[in-house]
């Protein structure tokens, strides 16, 4: 069978559900290495990564990722296919990319823990979910320029005619999330009050949130 109930669609859904549970894993890891007073803030930010990300991904991100190529394969053409082509829409692929979008955003929350205000983090989450992840994921997973580039390993052998493959998101998700985390930590600086006070003097390490 084709579509969401075909073998590919079912496999996409199973994989997507497993990835979705990574949100809980991220929440436990991050609350485990932050102070107990910030545990609620961390969990709420991880929850909003998915909630806010879903809204902007439906409205804009899905079109940029899965839409028809534009600008030499750099972006997809934004569309409202999720609403206008409801019956024939590729829902399994949509959900698969939605949870990966949330994962990309949540990777950064660990680096931003105890460094940002809640509103500032929400703005970041909207931007990476609506624009950053959809555009760079389109390059390889949406038929963009990386997936249609000249073969990297020639036209013969096991990797014949392969341009670029990211099987599980090592570059599109984890590399992008890591780079975003590094930039954010570099711009914001250390977590004042956890190890050093504002005068640079060591502080007593307080009780951590023992969720992990």
Residue positions per predicted region:
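Hydrophobic alpha-helical transmembrane bundles of multi-pass membrane proteins
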Residues: 1-212
């Amino acid at each position: 069978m084709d579509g969401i109930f075909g073998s590919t669609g079912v496999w996409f859904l199973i994989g997507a559900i497993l990835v979705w549970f990574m949100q809980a894993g991220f929440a436990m890891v991050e609350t485990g290495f932050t102070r107990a007073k910030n545990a609620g803030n961390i969990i709420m930010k991880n929850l909003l990564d998915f909630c806010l990300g879903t809204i902007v991904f439906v409205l804009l991100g899905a079109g940029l990722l899965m839409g028809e190529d534009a600008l030499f394969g750099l972006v997809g053409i934004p569309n409202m296919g999720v609403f206008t082509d409801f019956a024939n829409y590729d829902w399994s692929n949509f959900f698969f990319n939605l949870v990966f979008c949330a994962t990309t955003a949540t990777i950064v929350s660990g680096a931003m823990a105890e460094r940002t205000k809640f509103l500032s983090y929400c703005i970041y989450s909207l931007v990476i979910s609506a624009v950053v992840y959809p555009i760079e994921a389109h390059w390889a997973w949406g038929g963009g320029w990386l997936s249609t580039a000249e073969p990297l390993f020639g036209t013969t052998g096991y990797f014949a005619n392969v341009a670029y493959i990211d099987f599980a998101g090592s570059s599109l998700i984890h590399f992008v999330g890591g780079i975003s985390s590094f930039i954010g930590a570099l711009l914001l600086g250390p977590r004042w009050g956890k190890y050093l006070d504002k005068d640079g003097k060591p502080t007593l390490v307080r009780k951590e949130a023992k969720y992990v």
